[in-house]
A protein has these predicted regions:
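Short, membrane-interfacial amphipathic segments enriched in basic
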Residues: 3-27
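Short cytosolic juxtamembrane segments of multi-pass membrane proteins
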Residues: 280-287
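Membrane-interface helix starts
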Residues: 33-48
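Secretory targeting signals
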Residues: 16-17, 53-106, 131-195, 199, ...
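Membrane-interacting alpha-helical segments
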Residues: 22, 26-37, 168, 172, ...
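Helix-loop-helix units of permease transmembrane domains in multi-pass membrane transporters
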Residues: 29, 106-139, 278
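Terminal transmembrane helical anchor/hairpin motif
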Residues: 3, 59-83, 194, 199, ...
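Hydrophobic/aromatic residues in alpha-helical transmembrane segments
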Residues: 100-104, 117, 152, 184-187, ...
Length: 287
């Protein structure tokens, strides 16, 4: 018998060619996307994004009977104005953080809980690629469910005659939604990779810290994601109707470039920190 025939499993593992970071991320993405789409979280997500669709149907039904679903200072708010309010209050202020918390914190925590993380880490792939691949799957999964909901709400509320004038603003709103999912997902991916009880910490951050600091005067709000994300909303809406109402709710509205710079900085920094945490942390599986 030769020495090679007595090689240990780890020696055989070491002899395998190591996949590149990009190729490994793509492989993990392919495997994770199907699992996410058919998971219980997707059912929860469908129920969450179904709320605005149901509300839009109610508004449409009210307006079909000649009544006004929303008035501001005695003036009727048009269909796209109602859509803008729903984008701000329901999607950006609630749905995006909720999905970021429940999906982002679970990217690595679920693997630890299911005791499958050892299998992933024994493959000849960079550890960080596991997180990036699962993060990309999270983005694809949430966008595949959330964006159709937004489009349904838009076409229910906005008259066909107003679509040519408002479709550009809709695209900006969809961009804000995508950016919000990306940034919250990146932040909570780090929380899930670094902390032991990530869901609790994520909920406290999104619906505790952010909500309290936004309501308080001072500079602390500048260290929240919601401050920069919601500050972009007036820029994404037409300069009439409900825009003045929304702008009145913001004591401070930073320039667009400042908001985008901070949001992309949050995204890059926390994804990098999450990747480093996965590469360096020693995960201990509970019996």
């Amino acid at each position: 018998m030769t020495a090679a025939e007595f090689s240990r499993p780890q020696d055989l593992k070491a002899s395998r060619p190591r996949m590149s970071f990009f190729a490994a991320s793509r492989r993990v993405f392919d495997l994770s996307l199907g699992e996410m789409l058919w998971s219980r979280r997707t059912i929860f997500m469908a129920l969450v994004v179904g709320g605005p669709v149901l509300l839009a149907l109610i508004v449409k039904g009210v307006e079909m009977f000649g009544m006004s679903a929303l008035r501001v200072n005695g003036q009727r708010v048009a269909g796209f104005g109602i859509f803008g309010v729903m984008m701000w209050m329901l999607f950006l202020r609630f749905i995006v953080p909720v999905l970021g918390v429940f999906y982002g914190t679970a990217l690595m925590a679920d693997e630890v809980e299911d005791k499958t993380i050892t299998y992933l880490f024994t493959r000849p792939i960079p550890r960080g690629a596991v997180l990036i691949g699962k993060y990309l799957a999270y983005m694809a999964c949430t966008l595949l469910v959330v964006l159709p909901s937004v489009m349904i709400v838009y076409f229910l509320l906005v008259p066909f005659s107003a679509i040519p004038a408002t479709f550009g603003s809709l695209l900006v709103d969809l961009g804000l939604l995508t950016l919000g999912l990306a940034v919250y997902g990146g932040v909570f991916a780090f929380v899930g990779a670094f902390f032991k009880r990530p869901l609790v910490i994520g909920l406290l951050f999104a619906f505790g810290w952010e909500q309290v600091t936004l309501a308080l005067p001072g500079y602390l709000k500048q260290f929240t994601i919601a401050f920069y994300l919601q500050a972009l909303v007036p820029h994404a809406m037409p300069s009439e109707g409900v825009t003045s109402l929304l702008q009145g709710m913001f004591r401070e509205t930073p320039p667009v470039w400042v908001c985008l710079t901070w949001l992309f900085a949050y995204l890059g920094v926390f994804l990098w920190l999450a990747t480093r945490a996965v590469e360096r942390k020693e995960y201990i599986l509970e019996q």
